[in-house]
Amino acid sequence: MKPGMHVDNLHVERTSRFEQERNGKDNIMIETMQWVRPEEIEARSMAIIEAEMPEGNWTPGELAVVKRCIHTAADFDYASNLYFSDGAVELAVNLMKSGRGFTIVTDTNMALAGVNKAALKQLNGTVRCFMADPDVAAEAKERGVTRAIVSMEHAAKLTGPVIFAIGNAPTALIRLYEMMQKGEIQPDFIIGTPVGFVNVVESKELICQSDVPCIVARGRKGGSNIAAAVCNALMYQVTRA
């Protein structure tokens, strides 16, 4: 400490130097940032993804789904963990553009919120989530099972083409598989992207082994945002074509 300098003054001096150094670094960071128009951000992001992602044997439709998932999560693991059943993307796209309408069933309101409503409306589609329905909650409590199980049973009563987009609950995929095995339901398409550690990997593999057209994020990664991203990637192949 300099002669005659008070401790409080020393603290102020050090703080001032720290702030100057920090502000200098902040200014450097700001100067290196790219100025991008809002409407160009997604295209710029996709260009970065294309430049950095590994090579693969995807069809153009599959590649669009992979890129959308990477874009959503900023995670290049989706270049290797996405499973597509034979002709899955083409089948889903044809269903969506058929004009018959379709219903997307999600297992979370987050996934429901993430599905692009403008694209959905353009394709005469709807999106449903039964998880928060009072009767679903009451029945699940009475039976001692998860709401995801009961919500899948309620969804089985829907008419018309149905796409299941499951991004959170492995029990939803397991119940779907059980009902499929019993002939109680035959989904038109399944998107399986639950995230987590308990029964997640196993539930996804059940769907991969089924005869229902599907897109599955194998392994532990996934989430409601990924389920919605897959839905949007499929719809955009019609609405943005």
For the regions a language model picked out, list residue spans one by one.
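C-terminal functional extensions of proteins
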Residues: 198-241
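Generic secondary-structure signature for well-ordered alpha-helical cores
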Residues: 47-58, 71-78, 97-103, 120, ...
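Conserved, well-structured core segments that form the ligand-binding/active-site neighborhood
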Residues: 30-48, 184-189, 231-241
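Conserved mixed alpha/beta catalytic, RNA-binding, or beta-rich assembly cores of soluble enzyme
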Residues: 108-180, 187-188, 194-196, 204
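Short, Lys/Arg-enriched N-terminal segments with co-localized hydrophobic residues
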Residues: 17-28
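Electropositive, gly/pro-rich neighborhoods at or near active sites that engage anionic ligands
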Residues: 28-103
